[in-house]
Amino acid sequence: MYAVIKTGGKQYKVAEGEFLKVEKLVGEVGDSVEFGEVLMIGGEKIVVGAPHVAGATVTAKIAVQGKDKKILVFKSKRRKGTRKLRGHRQHKTVLKIEKISA
C-alpha cells in the first residue's frame, strides 16, 4: 500500500516502513507526525482525492533532524573582478513512515 502526501509545498509518494527526507518539521527526534493532506492512496484499489482523500492519514516518526548537503552559490561581474561565494545548507527532517490509514 502506498500514498501520496503533501508537505512543505511538495508531493511525496510514500509506503509503510520507508524513510523520507522532507523540509524541516517542528518536533524532536522520536516525535510522531500525522499528515492529513493525503492526495491519493494506492494498493489493490486506487483512491484519488478531490483534492484530499476523506478520512485518510499517514503517520510518521521523526528519525533525524539535520541539514542537507551544502550548495555553493557563486556570483561574479564580468570584467570587474567582483566575485562572491556563498554556501547554504537547508534544514531537513528524515521521517520513517509508520502507518497509512484510509
From Swiss-Prot:
Organism: Pelobacter propionicus (strain DSM 2379 / NBRC 103807 / OttBd1)
HAMAP family, alphabetized: Ribosomal_bL21
Entry superkingdom: Bacteria
Listed Pfam families: Ribosomal_L21p
InterPro entries: bL21-like, bL21-like_sf, Ribosomal_bL21, Ribosomal_bL21_CS
Keyword Ribonucleoprotein found: yes
Family: Belongs to the bacterial ribosomal protein bL21 family.
Protein name as it appears in the record: Large ribosomal subunit protein bL21
Keywords per UniProt: Ribonucleoprotein, Ribosomal protein, RNA-binding, rRNA-binding
Subunit structure: Part of the 50S ribosomal subunit. Contacts protein L20.
Gene Ontology biological process terms, A to Z: translation
Any one GO molecular function term: rRNA binding
One GO CC term on file: cytoplasm
Matches recorded under PROSITE patterns: RIBOSOMAL_L21
NCBIfam families: L21
Function: This protein binds to 23S rRNA in the presence of protein L20.
